[in-house]
């Protein structure tokens, strides 16, 4: 069983930036996402709405996400998404009814948030206050800088993230992005996909050790890169943090059958004995099930649109 905690899919095509094609090479249609499940041995996934305008001009409504889940309740669960600037850019805006509405309809958490604001921004802090109030899981994308990129920006040591981990202990933070996973190492290569051995002192390792409310969303090329750059470190990392790591893909385009993804990587590590069946099961589905409120595999496999 593999449950993917990081999926994006659109019902229809739309505006595409210059140089891109909306044919499952620039975000996936639902059909394309389901094909990726089949190609890469994934049973079910968590849809994350593309809602923050910082990154892409083609955005989604929550209604579109609900429609996708209603069409394929055996294949998808979903998060709600929101933007700290919603509700009139008010740092005292009440997100409660919005959150309650989507929880009542079946949403399991919040994300993926990619607003290009710092953690300490008053609008961000207000939104986190409300997520904490409802004790929800929260997927976030880290950025190294304001402007020219999307994602919550933080310094190399992730000091902003550490502050909110302390301040909001009832949020289960799902860390993601190249900037997040590059900081698994203690060196200064913290953008894109650094190669070579993982040096001691990486902020991500320290924060995973210290804070019970931080989890690692290992999706995208960045998560895979973090696990393939140093095989000896990876053996330790997967075993040591076996209760805190989450399988995901973040397929934003077509990935051919047979190409190495996190799915194939974990299958290979199980086959060669690098990880145990227990570690494999925890990372591939069990940790996600617990964080999304399911006690058993059967519950996770049930249809996900029962409240729409």
Model-flagged regions — what are they?
Residues 2-5, 47-48, 79-81, 111, ...:
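Active-site neighborhood of phospho(di)ester-bond hydrolases with catalytic His/Asp-centered motifs
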Residues 16-24, 54-60, 87-93, 147-156, ...:
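Short, flexible/disordered intra-domain loops and linkers
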Residues 1-44, 241-246, 252-308:
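Mid-to-C-terminal alpha-helical segments outside catalytic/metal-binding sites
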Residues 20, 24-55, 76-83, 108-115:
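Divalent metal-dependent hydrolysis catalytic cores, especially in the metallo-beta-lactamase
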Residues 56-155:
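Active-site gating/metal-coordination segments in enzymes
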Residues 51, 82-86, 116, 144-146, ...:
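Active-site-proximal loop/turn and secondary-structure-junction residues that shape catalytic pockets
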Residues 109, 121-247:
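Catalytic pocket-lining loop regions of alpha/beta-barrel enzymes
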Residues 26-34, 57-68, 93-98, 157-162, ...:
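Alpha-helical scaffolding within the catalytic cores
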């Amino acid at each position: 069983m593999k449950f993917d905690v990081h999926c994006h899919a659109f019902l229809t095509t739309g505006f595409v930036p210059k140089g891109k094609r909306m044919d499952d090479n620039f975000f996936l249609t639902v059909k394309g996402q389901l094909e990726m499940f089949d190609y890469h041995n994934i049973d079910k996934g968590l849809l994350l709405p593309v809602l923050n305008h910082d990154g892409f001009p083609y955005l989604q409504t929550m209604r579109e996400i609900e429609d996708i889940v209603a069409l394929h309740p055996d294949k998808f669960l979903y998060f709600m998404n929101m933007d700290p600037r919603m509700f009139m850019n008010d740092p005292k805006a009440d997100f409660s009814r919005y959150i309650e509405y989507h929880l009542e309809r079946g949403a399991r958490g919040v994300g993926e948030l990619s607003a290009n604001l710092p953690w300490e921004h008053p609008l961000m802090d207000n939104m986190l206050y409300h997520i904490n109030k409802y004790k929800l899981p929260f997927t976030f994308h880290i950025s190294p800088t304001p402007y020219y990129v999307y994602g919550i920006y933080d310094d190399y040591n992730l000091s902003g993230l550490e502050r909110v981990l302390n301040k909001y202990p009832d949020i289960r933070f799902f860390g993601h992005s190249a900037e997040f996973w590059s900081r698994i190492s203690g060196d200064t290569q913290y953008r894109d996909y650094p190669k070579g051995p993982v040096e001691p002192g990486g902020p991500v390792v320290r924060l995973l050790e210290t804070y019970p409310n931080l989890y690692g969303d290992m999706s995208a090329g960045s998560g895979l890169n973090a696990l393939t750059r140093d095989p000896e470190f990876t053996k330790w990392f997967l075993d040591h943090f076996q209760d805190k790591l989450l399988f995901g893909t973040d397929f934003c385009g077509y990935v051919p059958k047979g190409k190495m993804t996190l799915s194939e990587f974990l299958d290979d590590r199980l086959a060669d004995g690098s990880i145990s069946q227990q570690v494999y099961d925890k990372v591939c589905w069990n940790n996600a099930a617990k964080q999304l409120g399911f006690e058993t595999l059967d519950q996770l496999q049930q249809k996900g649109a029962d409240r729409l």
